[in-house]
C-alpha cells in the first residue's frame, strides 16, 4: 500500500475529495445527546462564577498580593526557579533560627509548665 504525496497542481482535486454533501436533518442536541441526562439543567441552575460575587479568598487579596502575582507571572522559568530557591533558603534559615530560640528557651526554663 503506497502513499502518494499530493503535488501543488492537483490541490483542487484534493479539496474536492474532502467535500461532504451529507445533509444533517436534525438539530445538534439530537445528534449529540447528553451523556448523563439532566446534567445540563443541573449545571445551568447554578449561578455562573463570573457573574456572582468573588469567592472569599479573592476578597481577602490586597493590592500588594496582586502586584506580587503579576511580578511572579512575568518572570522567566530560570528567574522563577531562582525566586523559589531563595524562598527555600529563607524558610530553612527561619527553621534554624526557630530551633536556636527553642533551645535557648529550654535552657532558660521558660517553656516549662508552671507547677501547681
UniProtKB/Swiss-Prot annotation:
GO terms for biological process: regulation of DNA-templated transcription. Component of the DREAM complex (also named LINC complex) at least composed of E2F4, E2F5, LIN9, LIN37, LIN52, LIN54, MYBL1, MYBL2, RBL1, RBL2, RBBP4, TFDP1 and TFDP2. The complex exists in quiescent cells where it represses cell cycle-dependent genes. It dissociates in S phase when LIN9, LIN37, LIN52 and LIN54 form a subcomplex that binds to MYBL2. GO terms for cellular component: DRM complex; nucleoplasm. It comes from Homo sapiens (Human). Keywords: Phosphoprotein. The gene is LIN52. The keyword Magnesium does not apply. InterPro entries: DREAM_LIN52. Belongs to the lin-52 family. The modification Phosphoserine is found at residues 28, 53. It holds the Pfam family LIN52. This is Protein lin-52 homolog. The lineage of its organism: Eukaryota, Metazoa, Chordata, Craniata, Vertebrata. The keyword Phosphoprotein applies.
Amino acid at each position: 500500500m503506497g502513499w502518494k504525496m499530493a503535488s501543488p497542481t492537483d490541490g483542487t482535486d484534493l479539496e474536492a475529495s474532502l467535500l461532504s454533501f451529507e445533509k444533517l436533518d436534525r438539530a445538534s442536541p439530537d445528534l449529540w445527546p447528553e451523556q448523563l441526562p439532566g446534567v445540563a439543567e443541573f449545571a445551568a441552575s447554578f449561578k455562573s462564577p463570573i457573574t456572582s460575587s468573588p469567592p472569599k479568598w479573592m476578597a481577602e487579596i490586597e493590592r500588594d498580593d496582586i502586584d506580587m502575582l503579576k511580578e511572579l507571572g512575568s518572570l522567566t522559568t530560570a528567574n522563577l526557579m531562582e525566586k523559589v530557591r531563595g524562598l527555600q533558603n529563607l524558610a530553612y534559615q527561619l527553621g534554624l533560627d526557630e530551633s536556636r530560640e527553642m533551645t535557648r528557651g529550654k535552657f532558660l526554663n521558660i517553656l516549662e509548665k508552671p507547677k501547681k
